């Protein structure tokens, strides 16, 4: 089986015999049931391939679709003029870059249709005349496809406020052509990571239909579990043989590491296509999607966010709280969700609330490592420390874990842990410990878990051990351990067969590390 790793052109995939997960029935629905659409999906999730498929369809390339679902649906196969804007791979951080890109594309099309302008005109008006000319020449409405419509904004987000405003104004004027040129248009499809509420393409009449959370199109990009098990049964079997395990074990590993995305209340399981194809191609389960690059705009945004990531994850939200992004508001939830680092995990119909959390282990470990590295700025390599810490907890070696934690915290610069008041200092140590433990994603880590007798600071559950931690800042480890006993935090685990450890920890705000540690079995 040939995997289209790094190939996003529908023509190449079909002509060169690469495996293709057939989404063409949904392509037909889009083409016949609407006119102007917007779809938000994370990077490397198949948006470019979708637009390439739409282009081939609207250009009437019937031979490419032989044997696919759409072959039995479409009868006419009319050819339309397709205008494809692909902003992928273009650097918009320089002033004037967006102007040059648009001018280059429009100039080429103006030459094609013999359009001559004596005076400089706005981009929207120039494109309007091009669309008119195309429709008149072909006798059919033109098709416009825009890949990563928001990249000129994301490239300068939290970096160049003035350039962000200029690029936004240019795009507002340019995308407004879809309203003016309605009679010359057959179909418009825009993709992007996020939905900027200030861009006029999402306001007024003829606005795009946002299908990002439509049940019907939830699986438009990505791979469903059914598609994985039916179309990739052979490579899963080969992977199991290579690893010396069962096919069920491979399916479970793939699910834990790459599944978990849900884009609507329909809750269809969607696997990350980039990671799945890479894993099956190499027969190795690795962090392919995350290591392919973390968006710089997200890192910059998180630098301005003063709450912990634990304040955002595993919580219920109204749709408006995570769908529309406003660039002038320092609230990263919509960007984190739409970038693919959080996803829908549950939906309560009565209250219209959505539970958001990490989709899978690849995203959770990668995102938390990024946040921890950025937040702590520790001199010790985080990945190396994490692997050894996991090994210690797995074997019940609490003393070794204590030494490692003490050493790690001592390596954090004083400037990072300097806080003005006691609640902030205590919050810093709690959050630091939370990040480190959540990184050990093979375990269940519950931070500040509510119980009938109070709130437990931290519980770590492994297959063989349960660790109950209580923290104090500038207090004593004995007081922390006494609180575990007096509050009965271990009571829910009385019938648990695993070995239980109660650990009282005292942090010193002066040294920035562990000062006291008491453990009881």
Predicted regions located by residue number:
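Active-site metal-binding core of divalent-cation-utilizing nuclease and nuclease-like domains
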Residues: 133-138, 439-463
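Domain-level recognition of nuclease-like catalytic cores that cleave nucleotide substrates
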Residues: 492, 496-521
């Amino acid at each position: 089986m040939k995997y289209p790793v790094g190939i996003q052109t529908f023509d190449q995939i079909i002509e060169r015999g690469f495996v293709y997960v057939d989404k063409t029935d949904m392509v037909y629905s889009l083409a016949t049931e609407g006119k102007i659409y917007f779809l938000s999906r994370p990077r490397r999730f198949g948006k470019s391939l979708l637009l390439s498929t739409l282009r081939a369809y609207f250009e009437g390339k019937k031979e490419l679709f032989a044997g696919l679902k759409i072959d039995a649906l479409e009868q006419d196969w009319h050819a339309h003029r397709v205008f494809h804007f692909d902003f992928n791979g273009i650097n918009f951080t320089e002033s004037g870059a967006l102007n040059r890109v648009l001018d280059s594309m429009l100039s080429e099309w103006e030459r094609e249709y013999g359009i001559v302008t004596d005076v400089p005109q706005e981009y929207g008006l120039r494109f309007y005349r091009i669309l008119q000319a195309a429709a008149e020449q072909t006798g059919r409405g033109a098709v416009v496809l825009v890949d990563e419509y928001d990249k000129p904004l994301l490239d300068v987000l939290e970096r160049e406020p003035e350039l962000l405003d200029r690029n936004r104004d240019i795009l507002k004027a340019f995308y407004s052509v879809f309203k003016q040129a309605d009679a010359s248009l057959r179909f418009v499809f825009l993709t992007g990571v996020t939905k900027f509420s200030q861009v006029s393409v999402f306001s007024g009449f003829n606005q795009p239909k946002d299908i990002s959370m439509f049940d019907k199109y939830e699986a438009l990009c990505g791979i469903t579990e059914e598609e994985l098990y039916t179309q990739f049964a052979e490579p899963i079997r080969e992977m199991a043989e290579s690893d010396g395990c069962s096919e069920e074990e491979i399916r479970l590993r793939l699910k834990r590491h790459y599944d978990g995305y849900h884009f609507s209340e329909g809750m269809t399981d969607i696997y990350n296509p980039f990671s799945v194809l890479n894993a099956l191609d190499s027969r190795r389960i690795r962090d392919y999607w995350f290591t392919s690059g973390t968006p710089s705009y997200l890192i910059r945004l998180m630098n301005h966010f003063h709450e912990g990531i634990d304040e955002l994850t595993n919580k219920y939200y109204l749709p408006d709280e995570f769908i529309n992004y406003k660039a002038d508001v320092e609230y990263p939830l919509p960007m984190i969700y739409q970038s693919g680092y959080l996803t829908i995990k549950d939906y309560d119909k009565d209250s219209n609330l959505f539970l958001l959390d990490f989709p899978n282990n690849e995203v959770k470990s990668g995102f938390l490592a990024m946040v921890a590295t950025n937040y702590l700025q520790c001199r010790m390599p985080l990945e190396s420390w994490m692997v050894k810490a996991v090994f210690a907890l797995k074997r019940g070696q609490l003393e070794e874990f204590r030494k490692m934690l003490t050493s790690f915290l001592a390596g954090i610069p004083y400037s990072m842990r300097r806080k003005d008041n006691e609640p902030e200092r205590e919050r810093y140590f709690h959050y630091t410990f939370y990040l480190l433990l959540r990184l050990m994603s093979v375990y269940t880590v519950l931070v500040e878990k509510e119980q009938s007798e109070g709130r437990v600071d931290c519980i770590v559950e492994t297959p063989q051990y349960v660790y109950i931690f209580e923290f104090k800042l500038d207090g004593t480890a004995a007081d922390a351990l006494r609180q575990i006993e007096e509050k009965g935090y271990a009571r829910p685990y009385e019938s648990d067969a695993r070995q239980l450890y109660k650990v009282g920890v005292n942090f010193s705000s002066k040294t920035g590390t562990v000062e006291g540690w008491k453990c009881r079995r």
